[in-house]
Amino acid sequence: KSIFERDRRDWLVIPDAIAAYIYETVNKMSPRVGQFLADAAQTPVVVGTRTFLIRETSKLTLLAEQLMEKIKNLWYTKVLGY
């Protein structure tokens, strides 16, 4: 598949996957520190920041998708003459 056809929202799961990997690794070495990380991830500041970032990146993703559609439309109409 080309980059235009792939699901462009896949990259939004990368930060969560990284956080889960870090948590699992730390938890294997020290369950106490792992529990501290789990508790810290649930604090209002972290949850609020994560929610804000997800909301804003979703907006940017939608804008990027709209831009790509406009570029594809221009390509087909102006360059290829369809």
Curated annotation (Swiss-Prot):
Single GO BP term: lipid metabolic process
GO cellular component entries: chylomicron; very-low-density lipoprotein particle
Keyword DNA repair on entry: no
Keyword terms, alphabetized: Storage protein, VLDL
Record note on quaternary structure: Monomer.
Annotated family: Belongs to the apovitellenin family.
Annotated protein name in UniProt: Apovitellenin-1
Species whose genome carries this gene: Anas platyrhynchos (Mallard)
